[in-house]
A protein has these predicted regions:
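Alpha/beta-hydrolase fold catalytic core
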Residues: 1, 10-11, 17-88, 111-112, ...
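Active-site loop/oxyanion-hole signature of alpha/beta-hydrolase fold enzymes
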Residues: 73-76, 119-157, 335
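Conserved HGGG/HGGXW glycine-rich cap/lid loop of the alpha/beta-hydrolase fold
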Residues: 76, 81-124
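Gly/Ala-rich beta-loop-alpha elbow adjacent to hydrolase catalytic centers
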Residues: 158, 162, 166
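Flexible "cap/lid" loop of the alpha/beta hydrolase fold
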Residues: 171, 178-212
Length: 345
């Protein structure tokens, strides 16, 4: 297996050797979050260009950050971001349609050596020709990555699709996982359709004349927050093709029309194919499990009750956030991840 590295041009050599203590009040978290996410930085040709301003807004040193890639056993490539020095202690898995950069602010706040992985079909990782993005399939890739890139069991954190992928991994390779944190997803939640505005966003064309066109479309549908936040999200989740057209990096956008046509919005009980095996995987996990429910996300109070009924030893925490907790409450999420001494961070 081959590993390729591309080192970020920005880092602080005076990185603190001590963990960041995030035990202040939630109002402070909200203030820091506002500063970190509302910094208006110019889009350039570097995926790392946003990090210095984000770290400055948080008041933390910017660790070394690099993009790494692994040639998988079947010839595909799995890509990731590595934050910090030393062996990774934490691995972060994003949700459908996102990429490793969704964790940037959380990773900076946590200040620990970690990996943020682009799942297959997302970011800089290869698309699958069979379009199989079931959690167990995705977990096989992450297993190869952790075998290659880590030397100790991981605090494995997965949001949405990444959470179910983490459960599948923890069930089959308990030696790789010290603790599993599942963010705003349970196997009983069907997120395949998503909000109506999200369906409208992906139901249109798959390529565009410019990133600016996508920014305008996203903002017209209420996505992305401020213009600066929307520009950052679009820049980090798109690429410019050889013909000059802009397309989403993730395969899901290109599969959206077919998936949306197959979904019956009138059948609320229709199970998502991605989640059918999730309960079995979670029941097989031997590591401690925490469910993080977003108060304004996809997991309801009843879903959380069912989660604890099936997994009585699991812990459930609630954060004031929307579904993408790592983007709307990243500092509070980092505080939660750092709050238990048993996690060793």
């Amino acid at each position: 297996m081959q590993i390729a590295k591309a080192t970020a041009p920005y880092y602080d050599k005076k990185r603190s050797k001590k963990p960041l203590i995030l035990s202040k009040s939630l109002p402070h978290f909200r203030t820091v979050l506002t500063r970190a996410q509302n910094v208006d930085v110019a889009i350039d040709n570097s995926e790392f260009s946003y990090l210095p301003a984000q770290a400055e807004a948080l008041g933390v040193p910017l660790p070394p950050v690099e993009r790494i890639a692994l040639r998988l056993s079947d010839g595909r490539t799995l890509s990731a971001l590595r934050f910090g020095t030393g062996s990774p202690e934490v691995t972060l898995l994003h949700g459908a349609g996102l990429n490793a950069h969704t964790w940037d602010t959380t990773a900076l706040a946590l200040q620990r050596p970690l990996l943020a992985i682009d799942l297959a079909g997302h970011g800089d990782s290869s698309w699958r020709e069979d379009a199989d993005y079931a959690p167990r399939t995705l977990a096989d890739d992450v297993v190869e990555a952790l075998d290659a890139w880590t030397t100790q069991p991981q605090l494995l954190v997965g949001q949405s699709l990444g959470g179910l992928t983490g459960a599948a991994l923890a069930a089959t390779r308990p030696d790789l996982v010290s603790e599993l944190v599942v963010v705003d997803i349970t196997p009983g939640v069907d997120v395949s359709a998503g909000p109506a505005a999200l369906r409208a966003f992906y139901a249109g064309p798959t390529d565009f004349a410019s990133r600016g066109e996508l920014v305008e479309k996203a903002m017209s549908l209420g996505f992305g927050g401020t213009r600066a936040e929307t520009e950052r999200g679009v820049f980090l989740n798109t690429r410019v093709r050889a013909d000059g057209r802009v397309e989403w990096k993730h395969h899901f956008a290109h599969l959206a029309a077919q998936a949306l046509a197959a979904h019956d919005p009138g059948d609320s009980a229709a199970p998502s194919a991605l989640h059918e095996t999730g309960w079995d995987d979670l029941a097989s996990v031997t590591a401690p499990i925490t469910l993080v429910r977003a108060a304004r996300g996809f997991v309801s109070e009843n879903d959380a009750v069912e989660f604890q009924r099936r997994l009585p030893d699991a812990h459930v925490a609630v954060l004031d956030a929307t579904h993408n907790v790592q983007e709307t409450a990243p500092v509070a999420l980092a505080a939660l991840l750092a709050s238990t001494p048993a996690r060793g961070i």
